[in-house]
């Protein structure tokens, strides 16, 4: 007599230590093998886009801090750049260099946190995370020097910055740039030579090139699948066209490659930072921008390469001091949409390793 079996539906979350926020995964299992996955989000929805339409352009800057709250500086940059484009505001040379410095520091800090949490998801509880937070703490202290905040910095302004870098910032940054490459090498050696990490990541959770494109994957997730796409190089903004750097690309699109891309990107960020510090000019840090901004009627889309991928802002102005439409293109949500293609066919034990490798923040997914 044939045995009749049924697939098992398993809910992981919405309150689970590995979901990186309040998030639910609804998975269908055939034994231990995943046959289907549905990400269920919205638990952290705050209505940021609608709230922003009821406030002035300046009052909306703090909302950007609370999207990917591990990438606040780059979020600020993407938004103020969109408003500057809409209003025709010019940014001074020194301010552009400072923006590059802060963006690349934010990229390193975000990758350090992402890799630490990824290893937590693999089962290497706390120790690697604390190693990486040791270096991230030095970057957070630099952000604290210039903004007065350790999180949600609210430092960028239309036309530049409200205040210049403090005197102690650059000496502390130079010390960090001297020591950080050695620690990145240490992290790579500890992780890439660990047999358990290799077994659980190499060839696991592959996102093929065509699926990465079709799902609009972004950032390290996209480049790990062999797509040479980075806004800093493909559509340069700010002054990124003045710097020499490489775009790390992998070819397998597996969990290991997504980890490795972030290691390589941190090295490139250090190289960009050294060039920016060396060439940082003197001068004004704030362009001419009215205190009450009323951009002419029109629309604009502006994008940057954030730590998680292409972050864009679409703004519509009706000529008043408040945006008529305020829309975010969130890379975390786009990468999350590719998760099903990565996990189907793998065992439920591999799910969190694959999920951790895409490095999402639910504040940006739900908004």
UniProtKB/Swiss-Prot annotation:
Domain of life: Bacteria
Assigned keywords, A-Z: Cell membrane, Membrane, NAD, Quinone, Translocase, Transport, Ubiquinone
Subunit details: NDH-1 is composed of 14 different subunits. Subunits NuoB, C, D, E, F, and G constitute the peripheral sector of the complex.
Principal location: membrane
Matching InterPro entries: NADH_Q_OxRdtase_suD, NADH_UbQ_OxRdtase_49kDa_CS, NDH1_su_D/H, NiFe-Hase_large
Pfam families: Complex1_49kDa (PF00346)
Enzyme class of the recorded protein, top EC level: translocase
Function according to Swiss-Prot or TrEMBL: NDH-1 shuttles electrons from NADH, via FMN and iron-sulfur (Fe-S) centers, to quinones in the respiratory chain. The immediate electron acceptor for the enzyme in this species is believed to be ubiquinone. Couples the redox reaction to proton translocation (for every two electrons transferred, four hydrogen ions are translocated across the cytoplasmic membrane), and thus conserves the redox energy in a proton gradient.
Reactions this protein catalyses: a quinone + NADH + 5 H(+)(in) = a quinol + NAD(+) + 4 H(+)(out)
Any one cellular-component term (Gene Ontology): plasma membrane
EC number, as in UniProt: 7.1.1.-
Protein family (similarity comment): Belongs to the complex I 49 kDa subunit family.
Membrane topology: Peripheral membrane protein
Subcellular localization: Cell membrane
Name this polypeptide is given: NADH-quinone oxidoreductase subunit D
Matching PANTHER family: NADH DEHYDROGENASE [UBIQUINONE] IRON-SULFUR PROTEIN 2, MITOCHONDRIAL, NADH-UBIQUINONE OXIDOREDUCTASE 49 KDA SUBUNIT
GO molecular function terms noted in the UniProt entry: NAD binding; NADH:ubiquinone reductase (non-electrogenic) activity; quinone binding
């Amino acid at each position: 007599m044939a045995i009749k079996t049924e697939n098992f539906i398993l809910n992981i979350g919405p309150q689970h230590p590995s979901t990186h926020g309040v998030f639910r995964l609804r998975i269908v299992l055939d034994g231990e093998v995943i046959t289907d996955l549905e990400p269920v989000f919205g638990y952290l929805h705050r209505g940021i886009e609608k709230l922003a339409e009821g406030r002035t352009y300046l009052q909306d800057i703090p909302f950007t801090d609370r999207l990917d709250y591990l990438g606040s500086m780059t979020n600020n940059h993407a938004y103020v750049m969109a408003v500057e484009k809409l209003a025709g505001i010019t940014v001074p040379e020194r301010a552009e260099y400072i923006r590059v410095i802060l963006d690349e520091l934010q990229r390193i800090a975000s990758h350090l946190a992402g890799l630490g949490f990824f290893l937590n998801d693999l089962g290497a509880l706390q120790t690697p995370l604390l190693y990486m937070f040791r270096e991230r703490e030095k970057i957070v202290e630099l952000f604290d020097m210039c903004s007065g905040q350790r999180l949600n910095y609210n430092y960028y302004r239309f036309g530049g910055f409200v205040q210049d870098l403090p005197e102690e910032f650059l000496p502390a940054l130079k010390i960090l740039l001297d020591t950080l490459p050695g620690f990145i090498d240490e992290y790579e050696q500890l992780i890439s030579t660990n047999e358990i990490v290799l077994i659980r990541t190499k060839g696991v959770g592959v996102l093929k090139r065509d699926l990465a494109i079709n799902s609009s994957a972004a950032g390290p997730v996209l480049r790990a699948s062999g797509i040479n796409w980075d806004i800093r190089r493909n559509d340069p903004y700010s002054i990124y066209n003045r710097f020499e750097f490489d775009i790390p690309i992998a070819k397998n699109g597996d969990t290991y490659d997504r980890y490795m891309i972030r290691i390589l990107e941190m090295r490139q960020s250090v190289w960009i930072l050294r060039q920016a510090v060396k060439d940082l000019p003197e001068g004004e840090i704030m362009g001419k921008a009215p205190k009450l901004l009323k951009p002419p009627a029109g629309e604009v889309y502006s994008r940057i390469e954030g730590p998680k991928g292409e972050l864009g802002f679409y703004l519509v102005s009706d000529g008043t001091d408040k945006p008529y439409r305020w829309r975010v293109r969130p890379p975390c949500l786009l990468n999350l949409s590719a998760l099903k293609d990565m996990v189907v066919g793998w065992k439920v034990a591999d799910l969190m390793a694959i999920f951790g490798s895409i490095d999402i923040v639910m504040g940006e997914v739900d908004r």
